[in-house]
Amino acid sequence: MKNDVISPEFDENGRPLRRIRSFVRRQGRLTKGQEHALENYWPVMGVEFSEDMLDFPALFGREAPVTLEIGFGMGASLVAMAKDRPEQDFLGIEVHSPGVGACLASAHEEGLSNLHVMCHDAVEVLHKMIPDNSLRMVQLFFPDPWHKARHNKRRIVQVPFAELVKSKLQLGGVFHMATDWEPYAEHMLEVMSSIDGYKNLSESNDYVPRPASRPVTKFEQRGHRLGHGVWDLMFERVK
């Protein structure tokens, strides 16, 4: 598995500049289980970054709706979703190798064949490897909120990124975001509402209740006990 992760900023035309990371490298140490998973299961479930567009039917061995999850953490929710929806295919992207290893181990334990993972910057993957109009859903759950005002530009949800996601969604495809930081939720809502071609699926034109399809994470359960909120946003590509 190659480990070459760079996150770009965008120029005024939406082209990526290799400057600003939307994440911090927190590689940490691999457990023996994660190391074993990377060595043994990556050749089967891992996808190396390249500048060639993916052929999803060839990758998964069938024609099926594809969900892309960006930043899957340790992979527990992604594996649960792939297990619950065997009729769909899932591609997960995560920049931290311990998380990739943990996800591979869980996916192998569940015997999943409808999940593949990548360890690379998601923006570059979207630009170089994801065909236009190919995704049923893009999921972005609990991205780094970059709390400090001077770091807000590092937030991954910006207009050029949301436009890029829209180009990869099929008509009727959905971009689903979730955050536990209300100012970031407000930022997401402002960005998404400014883009022509997206429809907010919220009846109140802001946030949606957590859909049953998104598992509650342990982190989220702890937040609920402490009285912390979570905001889900779902926007459909309508043109």
From Swiss-Prot:
Task: List positions binding substrate.
Answer: K148, D180, T217, K218, F219, E220
Instruction: State the superkingdom.
Output: Bacteria
> What does the entry list under GO cellular component?
tRNA methyltransferase complex
Matching PROSITE patterns, A to Z? SAM_MT_TRMB
Q: In which pathway does it act?
A: tRNA modification; N(7)-methylguanine-tRNA biosynthesis
Which keywords accompany this UniProt record? Methyltransferase, S-adenosyl-L-methionine, Transferase, tRNA processing
Catalyses: guanosine(46) in tRNA + S-adenosyl-L-methionine = N(7)-methylguanosine(46) in tRNA + S-adenosyl-L-homocysteine
UniProt region (Interaction with RNA), positions on chain: 150-155
Give an example GO molecular function. tRNA (guanine(46)-N7)-methyltransferase activity
Residues bound to S-adenosyl-L-methionine are E69, E94, D121, D144
Q: Please name the catalytic residues of this protein.
A: D144
Which enzyme class?
A: transferase
Under Pfam families, the record lists: Methyltransf_4
Q: What is its EC number?
A: 2.1.1.33
Q: Of which family is this protein a member?
A: Belongs to the class I-like SAM-binding methyltransferase superfamily. TrmB family.
Q: Which PANTHER family match?
A: 3-DEOXY-D-MANNO-OCTULOSONIC-ACID TRANSFERASE/TRNA GUANINE-N 7 - -METHYLTRANSFERASE (PTHR23417), PENTACOTRIPEPTIDE-REPEAT REGION OF PRORP DOMAIN-CONTAINING PROTEIN (PTHR23417:SF14)
- Function summary: Catalyzes the formation of N(7)-methylguanine at position 46 (m7G46) in tRNA.
NCBIfam families from the UniProt entry? tRNA (guanosine(46)-N7)-methyltransferase TrmB
Q: How does it assemble?
A: Monomer.
Its protein name is tRNA (guanine-N(7)-)-methyltransferase
Gene name, per UniProt, is trmB
